[in-house]
Amino acid sequence: SILLIMSLTISSQVSTDNSIHQFKVADISGNIFDFSELKGKKVMIVNTASKCGLTYQYESLQKLYSQYKDLNFVIIGFPSNDFLWQEPGSNDQIMDFCEQNYGVTFPMMSKIKVKGSKKHPIYQFLTEKSKNEFKDSKVTWNFQKYLINKAGKIEKIIAPKTRPDSEEIVSWITNGD
């Protein structure tokens, strides 16, 4: 019975957080970015690429971030080279590109895999219902958007071609919790 009590104690100490807030990842400068600091904020996670037909969305993403960041909204960019090698640069090159061409100030993370067997754990969470309790999904292209509520749960998955400043997204940012 002592063994049973010990195993119950150990299992109760294991994190059962099934929100985005459980993650710590490297940002584009190599520093740790702790998603638990986003509790109480709405979050858009978007996989990005510098040489894509949708790269122009950086401009809309930055405008959206500038306009709504004071309303507890944040955009997190995850560069990825998973779609036709459209993000070949290093983290430094990606950041320079984003700053010089689009004035990006929203948080950018280190380049990761968003699909396949080496998919980053945060994208495993975003795409697997067993981890996110919302739905299974696939990242279909660069600039797919995941809208995360203040509790760290996925509420919407937005197609890559949908502009960041679309009515659907703006309405989600500005309405309710």
Model-identified regions with their sequence ranges:
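N-terminal "domain-start" segment that seeds a small globular fold
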Residues: 13-36, 56, 121
